[in-house]
Design a protein with these regions (language model features):
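Conserved ABC ATPase "signature" region
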Residues: 103, 107, 113-128
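Conserved catalytic motifs of ABC-family nucleotide-binding domains
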Residues: 153
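Catalytic Walker B motif of ABC-type/P-loop ATPase nucleotide-binding domains
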Residues: 157-161
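Helical segment within the ABC ATPase nucleotide-binding domain
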Residues: 172-185
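ABC ATPase "signature
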Residues: 217-218
Length: 251
C-alpha cells in the first residue's frame, strides 16, 4: 500500500522574534506536492520572513520548517536543489546578459549548458538573450527570473510578488505563463502576492497571515464565505477578504 505523498512544505508553530518585534507568532500551514498555495497578507504580516526562513536565509526562533521532509538550514544544498525562487529582484547580475546569468546559475546547480538555450526559447527570451539584464523591461526581467528559477527543474517554486510593478497586460501574460508551467510540470508553488485576481486564477488554496499568524485558510471560495459570509466569489469579494483581514485581523 502506497502511503500519502510527502508535503512539499511543512511549517509548524513557526516563530521569529527580532529585537523590537515579533514577525511570526506560531505560524502553521502546509503545501502539498503539486499544489498552488497563495500566501497572503498586508505588508508586515510576516510573509517575507516566512519565505526567508523557508529558503534557509534566516533561522527561526522556534518551530519546524521542512522542504520535502528536510530542514532547509540543516540540509541546505539538498533541500534547495528542489526549490526555485523568483521575485521582482530576480537574483540576477544586472551587468551580465540574460544568457550569461542563466549559464552561471546552470553551473551552480550542475545543469547541462545545453539547457540554457532551451529555457531561453521556452520563455521567449531569444530577442534579449544577449542584452544585459539591467537593460530589460520589467516584464522581460520577470520572464528571465522565472527561467532562472526553473532552470534546474525544481519540485517547488517559491514566488514573491512575481507580477509586482507590471502593467496589467504583462501581468496577465506572466500569470498565463505560470499556469502553463504548473500544467506542464505539476510542481508545487508557494505564491506570495497582493493581487487577488491573480490569486484566484492561480491558487488552489490561500493562507491569510496577520501579525505572524494564520487567520484564514482554504480554497478562495471557502475563505470568502468564512470571512464575508457570502455565497458568491468574484474578484471584488476576494479584495474584500483581503481588506477585512488587513483591517480586523481575524476572520
Amino acid at each position: 500500500m502506497v502511503g500519502p505523498a510527502m508535503p512539499a512544505v511543512t511549517i509548524h508553530e513557526l516563530r521569529k522574534r527580532f529585537p523590537r518585534t515579533t514577525a511570526l507568532d506560531g505560524l502553521s500551514f502546509t503545501v502539498q506536492a503539486g499544489e498552488v498555495v497563495g500566501l497572503l497578507g498586508a505588508n508586515g504580516a510576516g510573509k517575507t520572513t516566512t519565505l526567508h526562513i523557508l529558503l534557509g536565509l534566516i533561522l527561526p526562533s522556534a518551530g519546524r520548517v521542512e522542504v520535502f521532509g528536510q530542514a532547509p538550514r540543516a540540509h541546505r544544498k539538498a533541500a534547495l536543489r528542489r526549490v526555485g525562487f523568483a521575485s521582482p529582484e530576480a537574483l540576477m547580475d544586472w551587468r551580465l546578459t540574460v544568457a550569461e546569468n542563466l549559464r552561471v546559475f546552470a553551473g551552480l546547480y550542475d545543469v547541462p549548458r545545453e539547457a540554457v538555450p532551451r529555457m531561453i526559447e521556452r520563455f521567449e527570451l531569444d530577442p534579449m538573450a544577449d542584452q544585459p539584464f539591467g537593460e530589460l523591461s520589467l516584464g522581460q526581467q520577470t520572464r528571465a527570473g522565472l527561467a532562472r528559477a526553473l532552470l534546474h527543474d525544481p519540485d517547488l517554486l517559491v514566488l514573491d510578488e512575481p507580477t509586482a510593478s507590471l502593467d496589467p497586460d504583462i501581468a496577465d501574460k506572466t500569470r498565463q505563463l505560470l499556469l502553463r508551467v504548473r500544467r506542464e510540470r505539476g510542481l508545487a508553488i508557494l505564491y506570495s502576492s497582493h493581487n487577488m485576481t491573480e490569486v484566484e486564477d492561480v491558487c488552489d488554496r490561500v493562507v491569510f497571515v496577520h501579525h505572524g499568524r494564520v487567520v484564514a485558510e482554504g480554497t478562495p471560495l471557502a475563505v470568502s464565505r468564512q470571512v464575508l459570509g457570502s455565497d458568491a466569489l468574484d474578484a471584488a469579494s476576494m479584495e474584500e477578504v483581503f481588506l477585512k483581514i488587513s483591517r480586523d485581523g481575524v476572520a
